[in-house]
Amino acid sequence: KNFLCSADLKEFIETYHLNLSMDGSLNPRDVFGSHDDADHVYNTPRAWFMERYLNPNTYRWDGALADFTPVSDDLPWCMVPEKKITVEDVKYVLSGHYQGTPYDPYGSYGDKSMRGAYRSIGINRNDFMALIQIRPDMEADCRPVEWIAYGSNAFNALVPFYADVEETPEYLNNTTGRVSTENFYWSSRLIAAMADASYNKSLFHVERYQERVAAKGHELINRYDARLSLIHISEPTR
């Protein structure tokens, strides 16, 4: 009753005897998921990292006494985060490479044996990232904001667009077939290529770049939200 699903999902599970529980309870992961060895490299660790970040105090995630580890098949199927989620939270999760854990492929201290053991969410083969921010307190024509980034998520920066716009600045909309710093797409790819090869030296600069782009994005959205609010007041039927 708490989740969206197909109207006939219960009938489908019963017809094909898919519920594997002994007590009649339903675990969707057991019914429709998998526990392959590959999951313990590509999927389960990523879910562990996300839940660890969004619910750091709900469970013990690290150490010998951890409630859940990167290879736990019984990770919570869904959770309510400990606080409201921001655009920056989503960006961090989708850029994750197990920062602060022994599994960070960019790690430079501690035990090296487990670095890169699990596939990161933010890897150097990322090419595009987008998230939709729905703002219920805004008018319909400016309620959704789409945040977009190009290149590797570990090094890229999100820029915001009103979802209803039909044109965007040349620097942002033109990818070109030629590698160049004259557009946002290739600039993002170039930053990632250089920073990936010199992570520890580049991290400080990359983080400052990401923070400044995000701050400018929020500043622009706030500025034009205010202008649009004046339009809505003067033209209430708009």
What are these regions (language model features)?
Residues 1-80:
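Extended, regular secondary-structure scaffolds
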Residues 8-11, 27, 37, 44, ...:
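Exposed alpha-helical structural elements
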Residues 17, 85-86, 151, 234:
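Helix N-terminus capping/helix-initiation residues
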Residues 44-54, 58-103, 107-117, 121-126, ...:
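Long, compositionally biased low-complexity segments
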Residues 107-225:
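Substrate-recognition/cap regions that form aromatic- and gly/pro-loop-enriched pockets
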Residues 231-237:
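Residue-level detector of conserved catalytic or cofactor/ligand-binding positions
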